[in-house]
Amino acid sequence: MSFNFKLTHLSLAAALLLPMAAWAERPGLPGPDQPEARGKAIAEITDATNLGFGDTTSEMEMILTNANGDVSERRLRFNTLENKDVTDGDWSMMIFDEPADVAGTAMLTYAHILDPDEQWMYLPALKRVKRISSVNKSGPFMGSEFAFEDFSSQEVGKYSYKWLRDEPCGELTCHVVERRPLYQYSGYKRTVAWTDSTDYQSRKVVYYDRKDALLKTLTFGDYQLYLDKYWRAHELFMENHVTKKTTTLRWEDYAFQTGLTAEDFTQNSLKRAR
């Protein structure tokens, strides 16, 4: 999805009114004079749009492109279980199907709020489950431009928030909110997220490394609505501004409320994932 920030005379006039207009759309949303409260409220509204999904299954194509334009592709499945305990995070599992050299590799994540997320990987070549250290979650996941922590559930309580501005993002209007991780061992000092003010879905996230230097940008596209309630982006594009590499994730075959249970998200189930 492209983002056009060029302002015509008309859109410039509209932009000057955006904070007031966005506030009017959400009567309970704190005003621009309360940037921290406003930023957190936007995150809470976004989170609320996804409550009650139960569980999901989907398939994904991962396209890796290096700085020379060389491309490699991987196929995997992604399962998620909503945690009924609202004080804790969701559970997820990723299973690689292609290419042959990574087939059967699987990662299990238990997301938490401020406690370190728990992550394990099953490596078929070694026939064992390996726990991923909390201090290593800023590293690249399976050679992609996504870090291990990027695949963890983005719980509201993991961050502090500060609303920066409202501005046009493509044909939409977006709230621009700075997030700073409250949990240990993040690879990011902060991220800046663009969330549309209509459906409250993420449109773009810019990541800054621990030294506060621009690191990478994630854009979301091809949103589709499921069960008349749950929005899912079918394409994610991550660009690393340092390595000049990119990773594209293309999602398909989303299914909701399939009957997955906690028994499908254990270390033993990692070994059985095929």
Q: What is each residue range found by the language model?
A:
Residues 108, 118-122, 128-132, 137-154, ...:
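Gly/Pro-enriched, hydrophobic low-complexity segments
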Residues 153-159, 166:
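Surface-exposed beta-loop interaction hotspot
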Residues 11-19:
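Bacterial N-terminal signal peptides
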